[in-house]
């Protein structure tokens, strides 16, 4: 059971009570916040998703990248139009895409939303679908949180944004990115025991 009354899902370790509406770095309460669900055909080809990926784009983020291409949905001040806030609507949209012979379900910027991600996966499976799960992350993750996903996530798709902590602080507003992300990627590798690349596709 993931405790959002003392949220430490990500390396910020804000320890806020999201169930009572307290906001940490990501500015998320305990509710479901999905900006978009869509069929995405531009994913990295090595994941083997020839028919595309059903991507769930969560709102908000645990980084503050000044160059973010999704800034309309990722920033604390973002007001997301038509945000999906109930599970049934989300799962119905996902199932409608999976029915089109789509075998991959991706979660984008899922770190602060892991309890919701897990519930969605469970509901999708109860509909009779077993897509491969892609965890698409900025790399700023807690190892202990990633361990909760062992056996659930099929493909980790991390960024490694910085090898320079000064740049990470200046451009994304986060401390100690390099060591934190390397430890997280190491845990992902421990779980999956292989790296997907052009020579070793899914």
Where are these regions (language model features)?
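Short, charged beta->alpha transition segments
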Residues: 63, 85-96
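Glycine-rich phosphate-binding "P-loop"
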Residues: 75-84, 104-109
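N-terminal [4Fe-4S]-dependent radical SAM core
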Residues: 1-62, 66, 70-77
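Short, conserved acidic/polar surface loops in the N-terminal third of protein domains
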Residues: 66-70, 77-82, 117-120, 145-146
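Short alpha-helix boundary/capping segments
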Residues: 53, 82, 173-176
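Conserved AdoMet/S-adenosylmethionine-binding subsite of the radical SAM
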Residues: 91-202
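Residues at secondary-structure transition points
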Residues: 56, 81-88
